[in-house]
Design a protein with these regions (language model features):
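Conserved nucleotide-sensing/catalytic segment adjacent to the nucleotide-binding pocket
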Residues: 1-35, 43-44
């Protein structure tokens, strides 16, 4: 396998991806934080940009797996910056779920299938 580390300009990494292969993107959560809060400010366009870049990448390899922490499901009252981040993360996950064939949530090692079917091993 090959490791490609990028926090910004994600589609530049496409040149390193085998179109017949599988990409594991870990993690959407860290990628959004890196793009949204660089230089001490808040880039409110980051969620849209990250979602678009990941959707574009997902069309390149045969299989694309994204890891995202579901911190937006907690129902807590957050400060404005955290609320913007959590909302942005939810936007990315909804965008990717609409794009992907399979959406699976793992909880305590157990899969919960939201969309599609798990591939046979």
């Amino acid at each position: 396998f090959t490791t490609v580390e990028r926090a910004r300009h994600l589609t530049v990494g496409l040149t390193a991806i085998d179109p017949t292969g599988t990409v594991l993107f870990d993690s959407v959560t860290a990628c959004l934080a890196a793009q949204m809060f660089e230089d001490g400010g808040m880039d409110t366009d980051a969620p849209r940009r990250v979602a678009a870049q990941l959707a574009a990448i997902s069309r390149h390899p045969a299989n694309f797996v994204c890891v995202c922490d579901g911190i937006f499901t907690g129902g807590e009252a957050y400060d404005p910056w955290t609320a913007a981040y959590v909302g942005g993360l939810a936007h990315i996950c909804r965008t990717l779920a609409a794009e992907f064939d399979v959406v699976c949530e793992m909880t305590m090692g157990l899969p919960h299938l939201w969309k599609g079917a798990l591939p046979r091993a």
